[in-house]
Amino acid sequence: IARGLGTAVTVAGFSLGGLLTAWLAQHEVVHHAVAIAPFLGVARLHPRTTPALTAALRALPNVFLWWNPLLRERLMPDHGYPRFPTRAIAEALGIANALTAHARVAPPATRRITIVTNTSETGVSNASAHELAGAWRAHGAGEVELAHITGLPPSHDVIEPLRPGTHARRAYRTLLPILHDARR
């Protein structure tokens, strides 16, 4: 649909959306793909453990866990759901595993890709993002850039504008130039 609306399509996504942006970059041609803190694995776990974690989560019964077990339903912002299903995490990690495996054997369809990581990331695996960029670069992929959001306290959700503090405003200093540059 987007291709019919203009001559250059830029796709950007955060977390699970970042994973789907990276998947799209691997399989489809877009002008520029910007994967922001893509959910390719879990922070502090070695990337090679992701397939085993995926299998375990798929085998276990689905449960809903709190994003923050201390704040529970008081977690802000109000428009966000305070829990997540383990089955959704398993399926997202399954997409990540398939993407990483495909990237090891084939170049991405998209020639211009930016992966943005948060140096104070607490949720997703920056190591997995670096591994994916390395796989793409090993195939001589066009332009694969790694950019980093720096200077934030430990966090994952760096773009939520209603979150207390200045996370989003500070993250936008890195993100907006990348997104504005997408038109080149």
Feature map (PLM): residue ranges:
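Active-site nucleophile loop of the alpha/beta-hydrolase fold
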Residues: 34-45
